[in-house]
Amino acid sequence: MKKKWTLEETKMLFKKPFFNLMFQAQEEHRKNFDPNTIQISTLLSIKTGSCPEDCKYCPQSSRYKTGLKKEPLLEIEQILSAAKKAKDSGSSRFCMGAAWKNPKEKDMPYLEKIIKKIKEMGMETCMTLGTLNSTQAKKLADAGLDFYNHNLDTSKNFYSNIITTRTYQERLHTLHAVRSSGMKVCSGGIIGLGEKKQDRIELLIELSNLSIQPESVPINMLVKIPGTPMADNKDVEPFDFIRIIAVARIMMPKSYIRLSAGRHKMNDQTQAMCFMAGANSIFYGCKLLTSDNPEEKHDLELFKKLDLIPENKTQTLLKEDEYKTIIKSSKIKKDQYYNAAII
């Protein structure tokens, strides 16, 4: 029987001495995962900008002047080319996002075709397209989509301070439609929106107490984009962020905890502590929308220092020439990459 986390239990985790918490998180992590492997995903924006939503952190919203260049839905050849390069760079999952409130019916056949073509390449697929109804979710699942990303962002109580054009319940309905279709769920949140510790606690409770816990949980650190209402938000204290990763690992022991947006602001030591706390997945690519992301070469160097192996590679350290091959093949157009937290 699945454990239901209570408010009091979760508060107690947050109150634990830091090293005790880290020890417990690492214990849980080792029960379910090889601590020396990491899952790598790559994201591509297949339709950029002009989103009608008012998410206060998002440069894709049409309501804010961020200088983001609008791009129509990409041609399938462009998408497949990026997917191939991502696979050659070590990614096992190719994620695609479109800046929509929800996909239009006229676009569904095209989306289904994209999924099928990428699946033929031997990669897992994930999409984030906004809210879905049950029929749309079933079509994507039938096309072979493995994961659907739809973040809760924050707690139910704080949510209306961030977004007014989509309700919290709509997000939960979408997650239910995704789960009912047979797809796997990717859902997490953003830290640094101005929320209090209580909101962080409630977000993790909401995620962990879903009928089935998300297979993938991206934890984002707010990327402050000039022109958005959150451009001047306070920075997140690194140890607070590491603590959230550790609590997420304990509460969702079998989920992949993804170190997501904001990673470019973390030094190697902070990232290493996040991995020690139970993070075992990253977004890998030159750029996350308008914000920077660690270069592939730097990521590979960090993996080597930490003896971390990409999940789709052999369980031995990559040889020097293999690293060089991956680095060489990872030169992808930087402006096509974005952060899944934006949808």
From Swiss-Prot:
Q: Where is the Radical SAM core domain?
A: 36-254
- The residues that the entry says bind [2Fe-2S] cluster are 95, 126, 186, 258
Keyword presence, tRNA-binding: no
Named cofactor requirement(s):
[4Fe-4S] cluster; [2Fe-2S] cluster
Entry keywords, A to Z: 2Fe-2S, 4Fe-4S, Biotin biosynthesis, Iron, Iron-sulfur, Metal-binding, S-adenosyl-L-methionine, Transferase
Q: Which reaction does it catalyse?
A: (4R,5S)-dethiobiotin + (sulfur carrier)-SH + 2 reduced [2Fe-2S]-[ferredoxin] + 2 S-adenosyl-L-methionine = (sulfur carrier)-H + biotin + 2 5'-deoxyadenosine + 2 L-methionine + 2 oxidized [2Fe-2S]-[ferredoxin]
Q: Which GO terms describe its molecular function?
A: 2 iron, 2 sulfur cluster binding; 4 iron, 4 sulfur cluster binding; biotin synthase activity; iron ion binding
Question: Pathway it belongs to?
Answer: Cofactor biosynthesis; biotin biosynthesis; biotin from 7,8-diaminononanoate: step 2/2
Q: What does the record say about how the cofactor binds?
A: Binds 1 [4Fe-4S] cluster. The cluster is coordinated with 3 cysteines and an exchangeable S-adenosyl-L-methionine. Binds 1 [2Fe-2S] cluster. The cluster is coordinated with 3 cysteines and 1 arginine.
Q: Which Pfam families match?
A: BATS (PF06968), Radical_SAM (PF04055)
* Summary of the function given for this chain in its UniProt record: Catalyzes the conversion of dethiobiotin (DTB) to biotin by the insertion of a sulfur atom into dethiobiotin via a radical-based mechanism.
Regarding protein family, the annotation reads:
Belongs to the radical SAM superfamily. Biotin synthase family.
Which HAMAP family would you find in this protein's record?
BioB
The subunit field of the Swiss-Prot or TrEMBL record says: Homodimer.
Any idea what this protein is called? Biotin synthase
Tell me the classification of the organism that encodes this protein.
Answer: Bacteria, Pseudomonadati, Pseudomonadota, Gammaproteobacteria, Enterobacterales
